[in-house]
Amino acid sequence: MNKILAANQTLTSEAVSEGHPDKIADQISDAILDEILKVDKNAKVACEVIITQNLVVIAGEINSPVKKTLDIKEIAKKIIKDIGYTNIDYGLDYKTITVIDAIGNQSQDIINAIKKKGSNALGAGDQGIIFGYACDETKNFLPAPYELANSILKKASNLRKSGAIEWLRPDSKSQVTIEYDKNRRPVKIKNIIVSHQHHPNISQKLIREPIIEEIIKPTIQDKSIIDENTTYCINPSGNFVIGGPTGDTGLTGRKIIADSYGGFARHGGGAYSGKDATKVDRSAAYMARYIAKNMVAAGISKEFELQLAYAIGIENPISIQITSGINDPKYANKILNFIVNNFDLTPNGIIEKLKLKQPIYLKTCTYGQLGKNEFEWEKLDFVKKIQTVLKK
């Protein structure tokens, strides 16, 4: 992103909960991917879900013998149950859903493009523009509004599932606006929005205080960035009783900004969920994040954005570019040469480095695809080498 040149400018990010209709679809897509990978590590999967009312339609293309034995309906039901949709009054009920399986086979043309006969190499599963980003605003190297927006909803989910706040229901969204100084450092939370589905028999007056005092404030680590001027918009539309797929149709891949950096970085448009690692929309996005995070952690810059571009069937990226964080062209070229010579950016190289044949994807797809330190692409194991070669 461009540098902020004036003080008192604000930046905003949003997040959605696991019970948001689009996120239900993402989770079903990734749960299906995981179940296939448990048996077939080399499966090719592109799974798309649409969910509306009490209907789930599962489509896409899968190339794996596991498809024949996969219990699609049970996978979908388990996800919906685990989220907390156990009563149709919530907007969905796992016990009564209708599931339509419309999954087809992967195109033979695509199969041939990805895997050439007589070669172990993998070409990219599609063309695409991919970005990876990191900044030094938080300990997870993510933008502060984005991290806080997700943390608020995770806290709400924990309190809902534990029964600590009984009137909460699964569907929710948040949005955080933070004021920055002229050096682009976060200095104050200006506004927090939380829209949370709730039981019909509770008033908005009784909803407001628990959301602020039990969910929002305990989530904010740095108390100095909130004050009496911080405003809270809690269910600004009024009642939020009708939620889940009864209120809105959900679709896989429709929350790509909430999945990545909350609007702080560019996005090539490709979604993550339901895709195996030959799809560079997902795997190369993880790799670009890994590189960017290690660059910022090494002190190369306060923020770093990397663009990768691929062509279907071709191993190596056709373009690599630093798109934010480095202003010196000569230094940028030195960094690019380092990236090319030290990181394998082919699909095979990325899959091996980041261990992407494992059934890990359901864990990635809620509350941000990035910033979860359990995953390989969040490791800071390249920092020392970067500092040795590149640190000015």
From Swiss-Prot:
Keyword Hydrolase on entry: no
Stretch list, region Flexible loop: 106-116
Cofactor: Mg(2+); K(+)
UniProt cross-references to CDD domains, sorted A to Z: S-AdoMet_synt
Principal location class: cytoplasm
Binding site for K(+): 48
EC numbers, comma separated: 2.5.1.6
Protein localization: Cytoplasm
One GO MF term: magnesium ion binding
Binding site for ATP: 20, 171-173, 248, 254-255, 271, 275
Binding site for L-methionine: 61, 106, 248, 279
Catalytically driven reaction(s): L-methionine + ATP + H2O = S-adenosyl-L-methionine + phosphate + diphosphate
Positions that bind Mg(2+): 22
Keywords annotated in UniProt: ATP-binding, Cytoplasm, Magnesium, Metal-binding, Nucleotide-binding, One-carbon metabolism, Potassium, Transferase
Pfam families (UniProt xref): S-AdoMet_synt_C (PF02773), S-AdoMet_synt_M (PF02772), S-AdoMet_synt_N (PF00438)
Keyword Transferase applies: yes
UniProt record similarity statement: Belongs to the AdoMet synthase family.
Function: Catalyzes the formation of S-adenosylmethionine (AdoMet) from methionine and ATP. The overall synthetic reaction is composed of two sequential steps, AdoMet formation and the subsequent tripolyphosphate hydrolysis which occurs prior to release of AdoMet from the enzyme.
HAMAP family: S_AdoMet_synth1
Subunit structure: Homotetramer; dimer of dimers.
The protein, known as: S-adenosylmethionine synthase
Protein species of origin: Borrelia garinii subsp. bavariensis (strain ATCC BAA-2496 / DSM 23469 / PBi)
